[in-house]
Swiss-Prot record:
The keyword Zinc applies. Its main location: cytoplasm. This is Rabankyrin-5. It comes from Mus musculus (Mouse). Proposed effector of Rab5. Binds to phosphatidylinositol 3-phosphate (PI(3)P). Involved in homotypic early endosome fusion and to a lesser extent in heterotypic fusion of chlathrin-coated vesicles with early endosomes. Required for correct endosomal localization. Involved in the internalization and trafficking of activated tyrosine kinase receptors such as PDGFRB. Regulates the subcellular localization of the retromer complex in a EHD1-dependent manner.
Amino acid sequence: MAEEEVAKLEKHLMLLRQEYVKLQKKLAETEKRCTLLAAQANKENSNESFISRLLAIVAGLYEQEQYSDLKIKVGDRHISAHKFVLAARSDSWSLANLSSTEEIDLSDANPEVTMTMLRWIYTDELEFREDDVFLTELMKLANRFQLQLLRERCEKGVMSLVNVRNCIRFYQTAEELNASTLMNYCAEIIASHWDDLRKEDFSSLSAQLLYKMIKSKTEYPLHKAIKVEREDVVFLYLIEMDSQLPGKLNETDHNGDLALDLALSRRLESIATTLVSHKADVDMVDKNGWSLLHKGIQRGDLFASTFLIKNGALVNAATAGAQETPLHLVALYSPKKYSADVMSEMAQIAEALLQAGANPNMQDSKGRTPLHLSIMARNDCVFSQLLQCKQLDLELKDHEGSTALWLAVQYITVSSDQSVNPFEDLPVVNGTSFDENSFAARLIQRGSNTDAPDVMTGNCLLQRAAGAGNEAAALFLATSGAHANHRNKWGETPLHTACRHGLANLTAELLQQGANPNLQTEEALPVPKESPVLMSSADSIYLQTPLHMAIAYNHPDVVSVILEQKANALHATNNLQIIPDFSLKDSRDQTVLGLALWTGMHTIAAQLLGSGASINDTMSDGQTLLHMAIQRQDSKSALFLLEHQADINVRTQDGETALQLAIKHQLPLVVDAICTRGADMSVPDEKGNPPLWLALASNLEDIASTLVRHGCDATCWGPGPSGCLQTLLHRAVDENNESTACFLIRSGCDVNSPRQPGTNGEGEEEARDGQTPLHLAASWGLEETVQCLLEFGANVNAQDAEGRTPVHVAISNQHSVIIQLLISHPNIELSVRDRQGLTPFACAMTYKNNKAAEAILKRESGAAEQVDNKGRNFLHVAVQNSDIESVLFLISVQANVNSRVQDASKLTPLHLAVQAGSEIIVRNLLLAGAKVNELTKHRQTALHLAAQQDLPTICSVLLENGVDFAAVDENGNNALHLAVMHGRLNNIRALLTECTVDAEAFNLRGQSPLHILGQYGKENAAAIFDLFLECMPEYPLDKPDAEGNTVLLLAYMKGNANLCRAIVRSGVRLGVNNNQGVNIFNYQVATKQLLFRLLDMLSKEPPWCDGSNCYECTAKFGVTTRKHHCRHCGRLLCHKCSTKEIPIIKFDLNKPVRVCNICFDVLTLGGVS
């Protein structure tokens, strides 16, 4: 990309240069034309002007003999010239100067350049060439002969050719010729590309000019003079700045570079020496706190480093941040990154530093000495130089607590883990031992401490190497005098560390070196902060032996080493070896045998047992290894212990047996093994649950089957609710655990026994309810359990304390599937009654379980006709309860719809339906064939019964179905009589409008329905009366009953004012007497108020009464006693009783007419008593 950009820029510059040349040509032509125009300003024809003709003549004289008075030698040629032309161009060729001259010698100049100048002199034409040398020569020649215009044009031509590489040369030329335009242009390019200029670009400049240029272009001329390697310019600077020395020598430029450092980095010894001689500070530091010596070493500069050391630079100066001395920087050079020559130079620098008094024990910001760094960088040359230094302290530790030896022993590592291999390059693989030339061996030979315990943790180098998994280093240390029983902060020995990290070879070596295998840790090891490679539950345990460690961290090869060591130690003559003790326990009371089991090292566990480890040791909580294996759900370990004769009868502190634990933790193989070894399978737990129940309650049928197979009792009587005795089957059913119940049934448990009272009679209702498991299952709706019980011979007809069979219970709890299962049983007896006398069918009807009832009828067809203690069959009860579903069901199963209740009433279902007021049942009974005219014991039809109640719809239904509406009961009443008697207006309307019932019929008391109305009328009597007149306008209202009472008289005697008024409005006779001579006028009442109001409301003259006696005084009419009528009330009166006369305006009787005394009072006083 960078090259493409450069190419584009060069192309762009080329275009700009071409464009610039074009513009110059155009400018020259324009200037020429401008001159011509000015010369002939006032002439119309420019071609004929003197000036133009003169210029044309001069141009034509170029290289012509005509008028020539001068020769010019150009190279080997002599060119004809003209003095006046030359004099016109330059003062140096004035006529006075050329008066005696015959020839001008220009042979010293470039002929081509000279000819170009002469052509321009005559023709004012100049052809530019992109040749900077040619233009420069032409410009010098023009300057020589004071051809100012030509020089300016050459300047402009040269400016188009100026670039970064030649700008210095053109600048020098411009200064020589005093070409200010070109010089300024070059100065601008130099200023913009100052930092891009190379020392070669300044080589041709004189010291004075270069110094002048540098001063004008940069703030730091000394630094620039050194960069261009011009000692003469440096000298000029020192002379000029003598009064400000040495301060000026120690200034840093914009890049932070010191003048001395620039000189040294360029190996300018003469300049560097000059600077130092003028008091330049050799220990000056840059902005980063690095001295010149640091920087020289950093860039691998032997010349600069040795120069500074010789000139007294501080050899122990440390950098500002990392606190690294020059010796540190030298030590950091690695042969993996640098060539042998560079490494050799570094060794020379190190030697020079040490000879100059460098301190080899100084530590950087990380606490590392040059020795540390030389080991990390594997800088053998510097390492050797440091070892030869007598002041070297081998035991200094860095901030990580590492000595030089610790870093050296990691040289052999093959791990790629950065915590193990801190070196940046690939680890070196050179076997498993350190030769005598290794850093580590040389350090130990020099006297380095092989233990060097860490201050914080107390880990010695051997433990650190083992902890890092560097077994080769650890073996090297172990065989080089490291202490085998050193204990760190937590009481851990190197043997512990080796076992924890699985270093079998190191373990064997340490045991050979006398390491004690019975030492126990004092504290739990801390959990590593970083993501640990090795994590175990053992991280929080202490009091561990090395063997605990090996087992806990699952290193069987290490365990084998220790076991072999024990076997060998028993026969060894080496007193250094100590025999391991397998009975030691860690902080969790775990022996090595227990840990071997939990880590799955059963082969090792067997070897431990063979070596005398106890299999039945109990922990502080009373648990054996068998208990713990079961609780861990470690079947393999549990079986291992059982195979090696672990005690199965030992209980935990909570009283749990191994069998109970195995069931609780769902270990079928362990349960089988324990049962095989004769465990007691009837021992209950602390809650009284036997092992079989524990298994079934957890849905562990495989374990339960194992227990049963080994002879476990499936019935198992035990304590139940309220202290009664129950079997496991009772309990399973009571808890709705069908899978458990079915398992117990299939396992041969007792399926028929009910719960029993406790040994001392304990137990409440449950102990005496007599319910078998089948009763309980039917009650809870456990279909699978019921089916299983029936399959395995449960008594389907067993009765509980209430006499109920299972089918009774199933029906009462509405469990349809169970009902079908029970009814389908071949041995079912459906005639069994409970204490309430209910058969299963009766129970089904009681609970409206039609499906059950239908199923029972299929088995026993006569079940529906059974009657209760009141003589009612199921249809009767259903009708009385208005249970339409049951009625429809019974109708559907062909129940007798005309059967009568077996009691004194002898009512049919239709009678009961009417009494219940259920229209839909009435309709369905009629549809099913109920006889509509069946009579009760009082000879009443269903219509009679409906008429007495407010059941107009049922009346209509009965009428539609052909009921005998004329039928009368034992009192001679038809349905209309009874409807009127009970004031059933709607029923009366139905009877009067929907049939032709005789509304004038008399009952045995000689009363028609209207007489009944007058005698029994209620609040709606007037409405009933109006209905009669509406339906029968010609009804004989004055017709008396058997005792001579009219409707009005009966109503008046009953005080039914509304009915009386309705009757009076209909125009009846008012004064009719009954057989006892009583009428409304003489009937004894508390007040005549009603009578007066009835008379007052007469709007027309009523019909006259007839008779043989006066209605008022009862005098018999004869010849002397004539008949008269009261013209107001129509009564038959004698003369004495009708003496008063008065006009009756409301009857349109304007003349006085006869009225009775009562009517006179009414007419005069109004309807007021």
